[in-house]
């Protein structure tokens, strides 16, 4: 085989702990990695590594199906989803399955179907994983050259990258098709308090879509997390799907340019580090999205956002005290600022009190009361609808603050309900996962770069305690 790489640059492409580079085997002697190093033993065994990945996919899909059915079995239609600790059914409801006006669940059968489909898929994946891990060929290069690869083969690696991008693009278009043609998706902004609707007028203007990417991440700007209508979200998926598919075709048809060949380290561990870095960014972005965004993650299913619960509390007490005769336009609070209403730094009328820091919240139950200059005093006096009062009282008592033992809600709110919001769970878990994936990115990037430079020898294992212990088998 012709040499695909410069020996000087890529000698020891993989960092082996004991310096041997024998191909076969899954033991420490032949691979340089002990059993607990997992897939590192399979760096050069493409067939076995395929088995590990397919089995891993099976475990993921099995969890999704089993947890889905568990949530269906425990679901009480009379209670909101966010009070029941559900993290999967809200995603299905957001996609428009099983829900009607106001986010009310009218049919749980689609949720059951989703769980069963995932379980069946996981069985297929599990079988494939076991087959390739135990029975299939150790390496794919000889029998199935299309599926085989050498980590150093840059052209093959970018072809694999291209295939992945095309699959991601297809995934983005599946959401577009669901929103446009297959029943629509749940829109929390639909008049009267949310409903499932088909998206008709997609936002495809590049200045609007890519404008989100160029926005500041701070305050009311909020980067891509500030998206607040479904036309923009689905239109963004059209753009994203197109870019992924076109980029995938590009990477399949082309070879890496000279600058790319020089800039990147071309080894299995380097690709692992790139992937972990990307997933870390996904995790941090998802964390911010689920915490702040009530359009992609409707409050009817996930509970209110923190700012939303806070503004709901101010609104609820404004409604109460106005009924008791308070003049909410002029009442003064203990600090000399308005007790119920005040002005923002830019002059809009906003809720007063501690919730002033959340003045740029937008929520479907509040927007009808705004005028051209912030909250409209006339509407607040004459136009508040019962559904707005009910919803804000509900959100006030379900703030997404809570510890693991379910002591939830605002500490000073005597009506707060003991629960932990799915927003808390999803934001926290994605932040923690994003953080650890970032650490993994740094670790594997460091090892891959050192290996490429030729000075990473790994840990000296000659005197490691485990070597003097009885083998497990």
Curated annotation (Swiss-Prot):
GO terms for molecular function: chlorophyll binding; electron transporter, transferring electrons within the cyclic electron transport pathway of photosynthesis activity; metal ion binding. GO terms for cellular component: photosystem II; plastid membrane; thylakoid membrane. The modification Phosphothreonine is found at residue 15. It comes from the Eukaryota. [CaMn4O5] cluster binds at residue 367. The keyword Acetylation applies. Binds multiple chlorophylls and provides some of the ligands for the Ca-4Mn-5O cluster of the oxygen-evolving complex. It may also provide a ligand for a Cl- that is required for oxygen evolution. PSII binds additional chlorophylls, carotenoids and specific lipids. The modification N-acetylthreonine is found at residue 15. Residues 1-14 form a propeptide. It is a multi-pass membrane protein. SUPFAM superfamilies: Photosystem II antenna protein-like. The keyword NADP does not apply. GO terms for biological process: photosynthetic electron transport in photosystem II. InterPro entries: PS_antenna-like, PS_II_antenna-like_sf, PSII_PsbC, PSII_PsbC_sf. The chain crosses the membrane at residues 69-93, 134-155, 178-200, 255-275, 291-312, 447-471. It is found in: Plastid membrane. Keywords: Acetylation, Chlorophyll, Chromophore, Manganese, Membrane, Metal-binding, Phosphoprotein, Photosynthesis, Photosystem II, Plastid, Transmembrane, Transmembrane helix. One of the components of the core complex of photosystem II (PSII). It binds chlorophyll and helps catalyze the primary light-induced photochemical processes of PSII. PSII is a light-driven water:plastoquinone oxidoreductase, using light energy to abstract electrons from H(2)O, generating O(2) and a proton gradient subsequently used for ATP formation. PSII is composed of 1 copy each of membrane proteins PsbA, PsbB, PsbC, PsbD, PsbE, PsbF, PsbH, PsbI, PsbJ, PsbK, PsbL, PsbM, PsbT, PsbX, PsbY, PsbZ, Psb30/Ycf12, at least 3 peripheral proteins of the oxygen-evolving complex and a large number of cofactors. It forms dimeric complexes. Belongs to the PsbB/PsbC family. PsbC subfamily. This is Photosystem II CP43 reaction center protein. It comes from Cuscuta exaltata. The gene is psbC.
């Amino acid at each position: 085989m012709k040499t695909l790489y410069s020996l000087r640059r890529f000698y020891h492409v993989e960092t082996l702990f004991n310096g041997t580079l024998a191909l076969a085997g899954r033991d420490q002697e032949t691979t340089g990695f002990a059993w607990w190093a997992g897939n590192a033993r399979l760096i050069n065994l493409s067939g076995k590594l395929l088995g590990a990945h397919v089995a891993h996919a099976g475990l993921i899909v099995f969890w999704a199906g089993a947890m889905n059915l568990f949530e269906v079995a425990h679901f009480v239609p009379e209670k909101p989803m966010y009070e029941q600790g559900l993290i999967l059914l809200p995603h299905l409801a957001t996609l428009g399955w099983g829900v009607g006006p106001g986010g009310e669940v009218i049919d749980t059968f689609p949720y059951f179907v989703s769980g069963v489909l995932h379980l069946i898929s996981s069985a297929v994946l599990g079988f494939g994983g076991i087959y390739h891990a135990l029975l299939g060929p150790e390496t794919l290069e000889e029998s199935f050259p299309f599926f085989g690869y050498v980590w150093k083969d840059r052209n093959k690696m970018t072809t694999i990258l291209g295939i992945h991008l095309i699959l991601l693009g297809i995934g983005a278009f599946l959401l577009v098709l669901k929103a446009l043609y297959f029943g629509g998706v749940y829109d929390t902004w639909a008049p009267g308090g949310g409903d499932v609707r088909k998206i008709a007028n997609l936002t495809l203007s590049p200045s609007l879509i890519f404008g989100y990417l160029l926005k500041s991440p701070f305050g009311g700007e909020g980067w891509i997390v500030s998206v607040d209508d479904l036309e923009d979200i689905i239109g963004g998926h059209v753009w994203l799907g197109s870019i992924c598919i076109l980029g995938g075709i590009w990477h399949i048809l082309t070879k890496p340019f000279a600058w790319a060949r020089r800039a990147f380290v071309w080894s299995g561990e380097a690709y692992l580090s790139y992937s972990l870095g990307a997933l870390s960014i996904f995790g941090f972005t998802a964390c911010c999205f689920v915490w702040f965004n009530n359009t992609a993650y409707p409050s009817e299913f996930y509970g209110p956002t923190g700012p939303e619960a806070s503004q709901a509390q101010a609104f609820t007490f404004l409604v109460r005290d106005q009924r008791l005769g308070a003049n909410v336009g002029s009442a003064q609070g203990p600090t000399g600022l308005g007790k119920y209403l005040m002005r923002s730094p830019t002059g809009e009328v906003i809720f007063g009190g501690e919730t002033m820091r959340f003045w740029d919240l937008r929520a479907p139950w509040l927007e009808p009361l705004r005028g051209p200059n912030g909250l409209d005093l006339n509407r607040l006096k004459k136009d508040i609808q019962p559904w707005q009062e009910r919803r804000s009282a509900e959100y006030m008592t379900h703030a997404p603050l809570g510890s693991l033992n379910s002591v939830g809600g605002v500490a000073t709110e005597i009506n707060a309900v003991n629960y932990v919001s799915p927003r808390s769970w999803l934001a926290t878990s994605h932040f923690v996962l994003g953080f650890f994936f970032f650490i993994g990115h740094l670790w594997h990037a460091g090892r891959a770069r050192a290996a490429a430079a030729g000075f990473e020898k790994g840990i000296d294992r000659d005197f490691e305690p485990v070597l003097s212990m009885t083998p497990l088998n």
